[in-house]
Amino acid sequence: MKDYSHLHIGVLALQGAVSEHLRQIEQLGANASAIKTVSELTALDGLVLPGGESTTIGRLMRQYGFIEAIQDVAKQGKGIFGTCAGMILLAKQLENDPTVHLGLMDICVQRNAFGRQVDSFQTALEIEGFATTFPAVFIRAPHIAQVNHEKVQCLATFQGHVVLAKQQNLLACAFHPELTTDLRVMQHFLEMC
């Protein structure tokens, strides 16, 4: 396995699947920190925006001054990886919702696109560049409804909808790779940092 010990990756720890992301980062050999204050962002090589409740995370990001600080992290070219709610936070537009959180990625996201909590599922997903399928866990998952194909690279689709996409230093994922033992999506992110 490649050496990632030189990387310091933070996971925004306002709400959501923080410990699961930290575990995967550490399993890959990188340094991992739960980020609770804006000042902790400066030492990072990359940041994960975890799944959780996007409205709650967005409100807390505004309350604690994270919006502009994370936008600055992105402008510096540092990697940002949004999973599920994190994808919603990264989007420049939400379908049928005027709310914009970070507005960094040229995508329009539909929230809860695959149904409610009771409709959660796991599927074998083909991801560009992966030799075998990935065990993707979808929980109240969004999908990308519209994408600027000139700026955004679509890495995976499910039922005709984009569920994993990359734009320069940004990675957006509709499913929860942190809830599996498969480290390849997180490793892909570390390669971006």
Curated annotation (Swiss-Prot):
<dbReference type="InterPro" id="IPR002161">
    <property type="entry name" value="PdxT/SNO"/>
</dbReference>
<dbReference type="GO" id="GO:0042823">
    <property type="term" value="P:pyridoxal phosphate biosynthetic process"/>
</dbReference>
<feature type="binding site">
    <location>
        <begin position="52"/>
        <end position="54"/>
    </location>
    <ligand>
        <name>L-glutamine</name>
    </ligand>
</feature>
<dbReference type="GO" id="GO:0005829">
    <property type="term" value="C:cytosol"/>
</dbReference>
<keyword id="KW-0315">Glutamine amidotransferase</keyword>
<feature type="binding site">
    <location>
        <begin position="139"/>
        <end position="140"/>
    </location>
    <ligand>
        <name>L-glutamine</name>
    </ligand>
</feature>
<feature type="active site" description="Nucleophile">
    <location>
        <position position="84"/>
    </location>
</feature>
<protein>
    <recommendedName>
        <fullName>Pyridoxal 5'-phosphate synthase subunit PdxT</fullName>
        <ecNumber>4.3.3.6</ecNumber>
        <ecNumber>3.5.1.2</ecNumber>
    </recommendedName>
</protein>
<comment type="function">
    <text>Catalyzes the hydrolysis of glutamine to glutamate and ammonia as part of the biosynthesis of pyridoxal 5'-phosphate. The resulting ammonia molecule is channeled to the active site of PdxS.</text>
</comment>
<comment type="subunit">
    <text>In the presence of PdxS, forms a dodecamer of heterodimers. Only shows activity in the heterodimer.</text>
</comment>
<dbReference type="InterPro" id="IPR021196">
    <property type="entry name" value="PdxT/SNO_CS"/>
</dbReference>
<feature type="active site" description="Charge relay system">
    <location>
        <position position="178"/>
    </location>
</feature>
<comment type="similarity">
    <text>Belongs to the glutaminase PdxT/SNO family.</text>
</comment>
<dbReference type="GO" id="GO:0006543">
    <property type="term" value="P:glutamine catabolic process"/>
</dbReference>
<dbReference type="GO" id="GO:1903600">
    <property type="term" value="C:glutaminase complex"/>
</dbReference>
<keyword id="KW-0663">Pyridoxal phosphate</keyword>
<comment type="pathway">
    <text>Cofactor biosynthesis; pyridoxal 5'-phosphate biosynthesis.</text>
</comment>
<dbReference type="GO" id="GO:0004359">
    <property type="term" value="F:glutaminase activity"/>
</dbReference>
<feature type="binding site">
    <location>
        <position position="111"/>
    </location>
    <ligand>
        <name>L-glutamine</name>
    </ligand>
</feature>
<dbReference type="Pfam" id="PF01174">
    <property type="entry name" value="SNO"/>
</dbReference>
<feature type="active site" description="Charge relay system">
    <location>
        <position position="176"/>
    </location>
</feature>
<keyword id="KW-0456">Lyase</keyword>
<dbReference type="GO" id="GO:0008614">
    <property type="term" value="P:pyridoxine metabolic process"/>
</dbReference>
<keyword id="KW-0378">Hydrolase</keyword>
<dbReference type="GO" id="GO:0036381">
    <property type="term" value="F:pyridoxal 5'-phosphate synthase (glutamine hydrolysing) activity"/>
</dbReference>
<dbReference type="InterPro" id="IPR029062">
    <property type="entry name" value="Class_I_gatase-like"/>
</dbReference>
